[in-house]
Structure formats: structure tokens, C-alpha cells
Design a protein with these regions (language model features):
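Extracytoplasmic beta-strand/coil segments of soluble accessory domains associated
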Residues: 98-135
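Short acidic/polar hinge/loop motifs at secondary-structure boundaries
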Residues: 134-161, 249, 472
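A beta-strand signature from Gram-negative outer-membrane beta-barrel systems
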Residues: 148-189
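Flexible loop and strand-edge segments within Gram-negative outer membrane beta-barrel domains
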Residues: 227-248, 254-316, 322-340
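Gram-negative outer-membrane beta-barrel transporters
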Residues: 406, 500, 504-509, 529-609, ...
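C-terminal beta-signal and adjacent terminal beta-strands/loops
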Residues: 554, 606, 627-686
Length: 686
């Protein structure tokens, strides 16, 4: 069920897509009923199913097993399409990378269920998150952002490594993750997905779209999830996963003509999490340690592209985005509340000077307003950023592209930005793609990136401990250089092709927000400070994909990370970062395309804990079976089938009120094996 058109860039029309669904809570039942009524008048629209076929669309190759591999893009980019997302339950963005060798996803703590990603051996804060080419999910939205994007809503995920284009700003350091949502102009009808797992987590998703005429389309996307099980599988007295409720609603409109593209989206989100000591473990002689996270988020974005008539390849684009994020956290006696308001605007002009030369220039404005309140014994002194503060950054950029057929592409870019907090700074970036022969493609990139650090807003799950939190009052802007080399080889072997990719990336920080656990400030302290010394990351990865027999494709990958930072004058391996990772995936689809079987095995390497001691390597296995029918499919799967989990995920769980209590040293699974079942439904004719 993979349908792809050109993605909305200032010069072309955006893509269209299908969707999913999941849930069984009363709130979700109401959502489904509302959606069914809203879509009762939809017209039928023919849609070609290309889940089994290969197509070539403007230099992009679409494969059922491996998503979309970029052929002509100058950057090292992988596009994960719905065909690959459907190989697992993929309830949200955080569960979309289980079969991806480049991106690691792990839990941030053992209390709130927050997930974090790592790319090139570094924290997800150094990955620029985009939604449809617009910077998003920043600052206070980072800690739980991977759970804010329902998997069935996604048309594709684009993962770009290394320095990114200057068009999207200056914040990309290790790469970008760009989320493409389902588009209203794609199809008529409704689609849904329902999901239930052995931990009694329920999900429901539903979307419907309507074409009012040949230019104007609208859609409504709904998501709800509910988990209320008070489960303590390891017997430490704390819930393994939080009780959680979430609602997520998006309304989209698109106007598409030969000379104008306009897209409007409004989104509402509410997320409630409750965890801590389980009810049966509460001791009458000791207060219950509770954890609560209550979040509301609202977004709106408007994208416009005007194609200038009589000037092929020339367009003017205006992109606007605004968000309001309000979160309230409770960790025992510690309280932290944060409200972030963000406004973003970009105006861009792009033109093809001739068949070899392209020029893009533009200007952007980003404004962030924070209002923070921190209280409790966890803070040694008043949090220095408490109260309201803001930052406005205005910038301009130019990017030139030289392209010599399919053989050579050179893309230098430069932007200048001025921040009300950090003054002016320059962001240079360069990408080169060279294909000496048709079988081999070489890429190189180098560029600088910057970030404005927000110690607690971006790292809130770290408050799930008894440590005293100390934040330096002179935090500086984070800066880093990233350099990368990659090679892609497509080697014919008989009638099949072996795809081999090798890449190396090096990231070096000029300044960094260093999070020092139990360091020179004393035991049981959490100290946020500037970098005093060196900090870098080396990443080497090799992966290969080969169709073993008809319908059966295997992918094997190996990655090595060497990430080190200076703590208290000593250069040490970054804690909770595995030295290596191995991945093997097998995907088989029967000749009739009615059955699909997917298996993914991972070997996660050893690493260091906060005290510089080692944690061991461990393996994981997940599998899924999918049965296709005409208007629906049923899938049954399991995660962590090796049943491996950390024996003691929470240190000091017997007395959470003592300084040694720590729920943040999570290096592996906190839950055992889990099985799930779900159904995907698609009605294109009502």
C-alpha cells in the first residue's frame, strides 16, 4: 500500500498516502463514531496498490522490503516508507526504527516511558526533527516527542545523516529526521488500525479524506491510546510502564493547482502518564513515590508554494508554523512545569539557472518563549532559568547546486543568523555526490551546527532520581562540526543485486551541554555545565541487502560507535552509549502476496554506566506475521522475544526518598517478552 508522489518542496507537489488505526477505550469509541459520521459522504477513488512492485520515481527506488533508497539525492538519505513501517506494529515514531541499523531507540528512564533516539552515537537532541520540511518537536517537546507521532499517520520518514541543507536552519548536527504525514489529496475513503498487546495497551487510529473538487481536499486524522495496567513484572515495587492516556487529532486541507500549492494543518494533542510505586507495594510506613506527566500541545502550520509561469523550475515558498506546548511534571516531591511557545516563518526563492545550476535563497525567523517553574528538594538552589525567557533568531541563507547529469553533484550552502541571546553566527555546509560508474556512488559532507541548550526542558526524565540538580547559570550555545563519507555499491549477482553501503562520520564539539552524573560536585548530583575539554564521536557502519530467493530479502548491518566527552578533566566514554550494534532482518512475502513474515534480530553492544562501570551486551528478537485481505489485513507479532531485561532497572527502589534512588540508568529493556495483535482496515469506496 505504498503510494508516492513528489514531496512538497517549494518546487513540487507533495505526496499522497494511505493510513492505519487502533483502540478500545470509551473516549476512542466516541472518536471513531465522530469520524465515521464525518466521512459518510466520501466519494470512491481508485488507488493502485504497489506494495509488491518496484518503481522508479525521479531517482527514488521504492522497494517493499527496504523502504525507499535515494538514488540521486546529494545527501546520505534513507526514506522509510509505509511498506517498511508495516513490518512491525509501529504504534508511534519511537517504534519505527526497530529494523533500521542507523537509529537507536531506548527508554530515557524506568518511570515515565519516555523514549530517546541516538544517531551517530549521540543523543537525539542533536538530530533536527522536521515535520514536512519544517523544524518541529524542539525544546520542551523533545523528551516525549517520539510518542507524539502516531505510526499510522506517517506516510514516510526521511533519515538524513551528517550535515543537512542550510534551508532547514542551523540546528542539525548529526542529521535530520523528517516526518511526512498522510496527505488529503491522495485518496478518498477511510482507513483505520486497531491494536492490543499483552500489556493491555489499546490503540485506535482512523483517518478519512474528501476531495471537494479537483483542487481542494481535506482530511481528518484521529488517534487514541490507553494503558491502565498496574504491572510490576520484576517485583521491585515500581510499575514497569506508566498508565497512559493520549488523544491526538489533526485536520488538514490542501489546495493544489498548476501554479499554486497551499497546505494547512491544525493539530491537538493531550498526553497523561502516571507511574511510580505500584499500589500493592505502597508501604504504610513510607509515603508513596509518584510520577505524573501531563502534557497538552497545539500546532498549526501553513505551507504555500507559487510556481512562476514561464520560468520552469522557479518558485517562491512561504512556510509558517506555530506551536504551544504545556507540560507539568511530578517526580516524588520534585515539581517542574514548562510552557513553550514557538513561532517559525521561512520565505524561500528557488530557481534553475539552467540544466546544471540551481540557486536557492531565503530568510527565516524563529522565536521561542519559555516559562519554567522548578521546585523541590532536588534543586540545590533556584533553577537559574526559572521564570520566563525568550530567544529570537533571524537568518538568511544561500545554497547553490551544480549537477552534471547523474555523475556529479556539488552543493555548497551558507547561512548567517543572529540570536538575541548569542549574537551572530555563520553556518557553512558542503555536500558532494560522485558516481564514477553506475554501480558505485560516493558521498561526502561537512558542516557546522548550533543549538540553544535548555537543561531541564530537554532532559526532564533525568529528574526521576534522588540526585540534587545543579544547573550552571552561564550555559553557552552548543556548536559542533560534522564530517562524513559514504559509499553505496549495487553489485549485480546473476539476476539479483547485492546492495552494500559503508559510511563513516565524525562529530567534534566546540561547546556542548555536558550532563555530569555524580561527578566533582559530589555523589548523587546531576550537574548541567558547559564543555571543559574535548567531546567527539566516531561512527562506522556497514550494511548489505540481498534478495536470497524470490520474495525473501535479508539485510545485515554492523555499526561501531566511539563517543567520548570530558568529565571533570577526564576524557571518558559517554555513558549509556553502546560500543557496537549488529542487525539482521529477514522479510518474506509469498508469491500470492497474501502472507508476509518479518523477523529482526539485534545485538546491542556493551557500554558504560554513570560510574564508568560496564553493562553487558544483549540480544533482542522481534517477529511479525501479516495476512492480507481485500479491504483489511491482520497482523500478529512479538517484541523482545528473547525475554531479556535489566534485572534491576531502578536503583534504590526499596526507598525512593533517599539520594541513591535512580530510575535513569536504562541501558536495555525494562519489560520482558510482549505479544500483540492488530488489524488494518481500508475502505476507499463508501
Amino acid at each position: 500500500m505504498l503510494h508516492i508522489k513528489n514531496m512538497v518542496c517549494p518546487r513540487c507537489v507533495m505526496a499522497a498516502r494511505g493510513i492505519l488505526i487502533t483502540h478500545m477505550d470509551p473516549i476512542i469509541s466516541k472518536i471513531i463514531c465522530t469520524m465515521l459520521m464525518a466521512t459518510a459522504c466520501l466519494r470512491a477513488a481508485a488507488q493502485t496498490d504497489t506494495i509488491y512492485k518496484e518503481h522508479k520515481l525521479q531517482g527514488i527506488e521504492v522497494k517493499a522490503t527496504n523502504g525507499i533508497k535515494s538514488k540521486n539525492r546529494v545527501g546520505n538519505t534513507e526514506i522509510i516508507g509505509q511498506a517498511q513501517l508495516f513490518r512491525a506494529a509501529c504504534c508511534n515514531l519511537g517504534e519505527s526504527f526497530t529494523a533500521n541499523p542507523s537509529v537507536d531507540v531506548s527508554y530515557s528512564d524506568a518511570a515515565t516511558g519516555a523514549r530517546q533516539i541516538k544517531l551517530l552515537g549521540l543523543s537525539g537532541t542533536y538530530v533536527q526533527m522536521l515535520t514536512e520540511n519544517i523544524p518541529n518537536l524542539r525544546g520542551a517537546g523533545i523528551p516525549y516527542s517520539l510518542g507524539y507521532v502516531p505510526g499510522p499517520w506517517m506516510q514516510s520518514i526521511q533519515v538524513s545523516k551528517g550535515a543537512a541543507s542550510v534551508k532547514n536552519g542551523y540546528e542539525s548536527i548529526t542529521g535530520q529526521i523528517d516526518i511526512e504525514y498522510l496527505k488529503p489529496q491522495g485518496t478518498d475513503g477511510i482507513r483505520g488500525n486497531a491494536y492490543l498487546d499483552s500489556n493491555l495497551k489499546q490503540e485506535a487510529n482512523l483517518d478519512g479524506s474528501i476531495h471537494l473538487n479537483d483542487r481542494l481536499s481535506g482530511s481528518l486524522l484521529l488517534h487514541g491510546e490507553n494503558r491502565q495496567r498496574d504491572h510490576d513484572g520484576n517485583g521491585d515495587g515500581f510499575m514497569d510502564m506508566p498508565r497512559q492516556k493520549q488523544y491526538n487529532v489533526m485536520n488538514r486541507w490542501a489546495y493544489v493547482s498548476s501554479g499554486l500549492i497551499s497546505q494547512l494543518a491544525i493539530r491537538l494533542l493531550g498526553d497523561q502518564r502516571s507511574s511510580g510505586m505500584s499500589s500493592h507495594a505502597a508501604n504504610h510506613d513510607m509515603r508513596r513515590y509518584g510520577v505524573d506527566v501531563n502534557t497538552h500541545r497545539y500546532e498549526a502550520q501553513w505551507k504555500n508554494a507559487l510556481m512562476l509561469q514561464g520560468r520552469p523550475g522557479t518558485s517562491i515558498a512561504l512556510m509558517l508554523h506555530g506551536s504551544w506546548h504545556d507540560a507539568h511534571y511530578t517526580f516524588g516531591d520534585t515539581r517542574y512545569n514548562v510552557t513553550q511557545k514557538n513561532g517559525y516563518a521561512q520565505l524561500m526563492y528557488e530557481t534553475d539557472l539552467d540544466e546544471h545550476h540551481n540557486l536557492a535563497v531565503g530568510t527565516s525567523l524563529n522565536h521561542d518563549y519559555y516559562d519554567e517553574l522548578a521546585s523541590g528538594a532536588a534543586f540545590a538552589s533556584p533553577y537559574p532559568a526559572a521564570g520566563s525567557h525568550s530567544e529570537s533568531t533571524i537568518g538568511a541563507y544561500a545554497q547553490y547546486t551544480y549537477k552534471l547529469g547523474e555523475q556529479l553533484t556539488v552543493m555548497p550552502g551558507l547561512r548567517y543568523d543572529h540570536s538575541t541571546l548569542y549574537g551572530g553566527f555563520v553556518t557553512p555546509r558542503l555536500h558532494v555526490k560522485y558516481a564514477p560508474v553506475s554501480l558505485l556512488t560516493l558521498r561526502a559532507s561537512v558542516g557546522k551546527g548550533y543549538r540553544s541548550p535548555h537543561a531541564l526542558a530537554e532532559n526532564t526524565p533525568l529528574l526521576a532520581s534522588g540526585r540534587t540538580c545543579i544547573v550552571a547559570n552561564d550555559l553557552k550555545q552548543e556548536t559542533a562540526w560534522n564530517m562524513g563519507l559514504s559509499a553505496a555499491l549495487n553489485l549485480p549477482i546473476g539476476s539479483k543485486t547485492l546492495e552494500v553501503n559503508a559510511e563513516y562520520y565524525y562529530t567534534r564539539f566546540g561547546n556542548q551541554l555536558v550532563i555530569n552524573f555524580d561527578g566533582a560536585r559530589g555523589d548523587h548530583t546531576l550537574f548541567f555545565d558547559n564543555l571543559h575539554g574535548r567531546s567527539y564521536s566516531h561512527t562506522l557502519q556497514v550494511d548489505a541487502t540481498y534478495p536470497l530467493v524470490e520474495g525473501l530479502t535479508a539485510t545485515a548491518a554492523w555499526r561501531y560507535n566511539d563517543a567520548r566527552t570530558t568529565y571533570d578533566g577526564q576524557l571518558r566514554q559517554r555513558p549509556l552509549t553502546s560500543l557496537y550494534k549488529g542487525l539482521l532482518t529477514l522479510s518474506y512475502k509469498t508469491p500470492t502476496a497474501l502472507w508476509q513474515f518479518d523477523v529482526t534480530g539485534q545485538l546491542n553492544g556493551k557500554g558504560k554506566l554513570y560510574d564508568n562501570s560496564d553493562y553487558p551486551a544483549y540480544g533482542q528478537l522481534q517477529a511479525q506475521v501479516t495476512r492480507e485481505f481485500r479491504h483489511f489485513s491482520v497482523y500478529l507479532g512479538g517484541e523482545n522475544l528473547t525475554n531479556y531485561r535489566i534485572a534491576r532497572p531502578i536503583v534504590g527502589a526499596e526507598n525512593p526518598w533517599q539520594p541513591s534512588f535512580d530510575a535513569t540508568q536504562i541501558w536495555g529493556p525494562t519489560e520482558g517478552a510482549m505479544v500483540y495483535i492488530g488489524i488494518r482496515i481500508k475502505f476507499e469506496t463508501l
